[in-house]
């Protein structure tokens, strides 16, 4: 390649870049998988919670790519294996976890509503999952991965960034609060974290400014 004057991009052959690519792929497939399962009769409790208790429309559920992880232990794991991914790749994506007796792997999220964590490029970097049966913790997050770092991620900013730049940021407590506010037409919302202020500035880009409104 060098003799032919062709410069190869090293990042395409970098092991870390290739691992990140696999994680993005697995997350994308997982997002679609859980979205589809939300339409299944076994997801009736999740459907009832979202539509009746939280009053979310089909459009909102679809826009935020909300899904459902069933009670089964390894449905997603087996699905991803059939898609051609190996156990280590799936584990590094954070969507499976080791069994307590260390004798294998199970899906990380079970009987939970799934909220994909979307970055500013529109890619899923991780997941937050809400318990439907009282299992603790109430909200379970993806572990830290090569593409997900919880202290630098802002949920919903992919949709609210433009409005925050012009209207200021309105803080809310969690995913459901943000989604409900967004559906109601309040589109400059972001989830409140202690570290949030400087992270918003970084995410919006250098030179951006905005007012902060606390709710």
Regions found by a protein language model. Name each.
Residues 1-45:
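Conserved active-site segments centered on acidic
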Residues 5-13, 54-66, 85-92:
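Short, surface-exposed acidic
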Residues 15-22, 26-29, 72-188:
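Phosphate-handling DNA/RNA-contact segment within nucleic-acid enzymes
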Residues 41, 53-61, 67-77:
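Membrane-proximal amphipathic helices and linker segments at transmembrane-helix boundaries
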Residues 50:
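Structured alpha-helical
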Residues 69, 130, 194:
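Flexible loop residues that form catalytic
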Residues 71, 176, 195-199:
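Short alpha-helical
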Residues 187-215:
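Conserved N-terminal catalytic core of the sugar/cofactor nucleotidyltransferase
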């Amino acid at each position: 390649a060098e003799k032919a004057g062709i410069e190869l991009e090293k990042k395409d052959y970098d092991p870390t870049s290739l691992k990140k690519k696999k994680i993005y792929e697995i997350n994308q497939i997982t997002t679609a998988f859980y979205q589809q399962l939300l339409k299944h009769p076994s997801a009736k409790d999740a459907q009832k919670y979202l539509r009746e208790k939280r009053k979310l429309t089909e459009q909102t559920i679809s826009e935020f790519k909300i899904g459902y992880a069933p009670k089964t232990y390894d449905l997603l794991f087996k699905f991803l294996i059939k898609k051609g991914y190996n156990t280590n790749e799936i584990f590094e994506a954070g969507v499976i976890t080791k069994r307590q007796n260390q004798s294998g792997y199970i899906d990380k999220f079970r009987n939970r509503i799934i909220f994909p964590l979307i970055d500013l490029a529109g890619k899923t970097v991780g997941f937050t999952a809400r318990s439907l049966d009282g299992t603790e913790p109430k909200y379970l997050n993806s572990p830290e991965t090569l593409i997900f770092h919880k202290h630098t991620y802002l949920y919903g900013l992919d949709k609210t960034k433009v409005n925050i730049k012009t209207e200021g940021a309105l803080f809310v407590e969690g995913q459901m609060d943000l989604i409900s506010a967004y559906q109601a037409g309040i589109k400059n919302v972001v989830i409140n974290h202690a570290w949030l202020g400087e992270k918003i500035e970084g995410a919006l880009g250098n030179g951006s400014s905005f007012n902060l409104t606390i709710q």
